Design a protein with these regions (language model features):
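N-terminal pre-domain/capping segments
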Residues: 1-101
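Acidic (Asp/Glu)-rich catalytic clusters
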Residues: 3-7, 33-41, 54-75, 102-110, ...
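Distinct, well-ordered alpha-helical segments
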Residues: 23-34, 56-64, 126-144, 160-178, ...
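Active-site acidic/histidine proton-transfer and metal-coordination neighborhood
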Residues: 68-69, 85-184, 191
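Acidic/histidine-rich catalytic cores of soluble enzymes
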Residues: 142-240, 246
Length: 307
């Protein structure tokens, strides 16, 4: 557990620039996102580098300054193109180069968390998955001595069953590589498992598993993505908002015991982390409502009557 990564209270924030930001009085400059988050009493932003790290040093330094001014934490989401399990050496080489560019940006912008997807693996069998995981771990270990100290990669759980990133995969990566920590996207866990996070206890069981495999200190290292999701036979289908309802339940993997809302639910999640005395970073990726989803979770956390 890195003490610099531990907070006295949970940090609630957003992924990227929510649509509501561009409808606000702060919309004239993207750098105003930090003041906007402070205005909303939120604590964090995860900057998306989906299609590559393109931010220039000057902009990164400006963001760093504003984040400090408004006391907003920053994490980076690495490009989706990182595929360390590929059988093509050229693809692996480009993936490692993208990781190094993320580390450079993290140093400049004063972020110590880089979230990445373990990605695809060649083949379709369980054996192919195991081999892909071995290759990913091998390539991560190969850069151990070349990365800056105090900045960590966070391996994110996958939403699609055909990808690396099951909860078991993430634990195995974190066990093998000292500079990798777990990013639990609970909507992805819900989707990957075919829809299982319908209760506080089911989320608590996920936390128990991480604690059992990685130790109690690992609980404070977890970085969360939290929002509801629509699920189909392949896993995650679509991000949803907390206030969305299901119009045609026959299209969803639900049974009569569950209502017409999407899961996982914020109250189940907050109660589970409170039972574990966790104070993590929680990034909301709810559909077109990241900031309101983050506020919902923060309000539940500080509400005295939640049980």
């Amino acid at each position: 557990m890195d003490e610099k990564n531990v907070f006295d209270v949970p940090q609630f924030g957003v992924a990227g620039f929510p649509p509501a930001f561009f409808e606000s009085e702060f919309k004239k400059k993207r750098e105003n996102i930090f003041e906007w988050l402070d205005y909303l009493s939120l604590d964090w932003i995860e900057l998306q580098n989906t299609y590559g790290v393109k931010m220039q040093n000057e902009q990164a330094l400006k963001y760093c300054e504003l984040a400090r001014k408004f006391n907003i934490g920053i994490s980076l989401h690495a490009p989706y193109y990182i595929t360390l399990a590929s059988g093509d050496p050229a693809v692996v080489k480009r993936s490692i180069e993208r990781i190094f560019r993320c580390f450079h940006l993290a140093e400049t912008i004063n972020a110590n968390r880089i979230i990445f997807h373990p990605g695809h693996f060649p083949g379709t069998t369980d054996g192919d998955r195991r081999n892909g995981l071995k290759q990913l771990i091998k390539h991560l270990l190969s850069i151990k001595n070349d990365i800056p100290k105090g900045i960590y990669l966070y391996a994110e759980t996958a939403g699609k069953k055909a990808q690396l990133g099951s909860l078991k995969d993430i634990v195995q990566i974190c066990s093998a590589v000292s500079f990798v920590k777990p990013c639990l996207d609970l909507a992805h866990v819900h989707g990957f498992t075919g829809g299982t996070l319908y209760s506080e206890e089911s989320i608590y069981t996920v936390l128990d598993y991480v604690e059992e495999k990685l130790g109690v200190n690992a609980l404070q290292d977890i970085h969360f993505h939290m929002y509801p999701v629509e699920v189909d036979k392949n896993g995650e289908k679509k991000h949803r908002a907390f206030n969305e309802t299901i119009e045609n339940q026959q299209l969803c993997l639900m049974d009569e015991a569950h209502s017409n809302i999407y899961y996982p639910r914020p109250e189940h999640f907050i109660n589970a982390i409170k039972r574990k005395s966790m104070t993590p970073v929680i990034v909301c990726e709810a559909l077109n409502s990241q900031e309101s989803g983050a506020r919902i979770m923060k309000d539940i956390y500080y509400r005295k009557d939640n049980i």
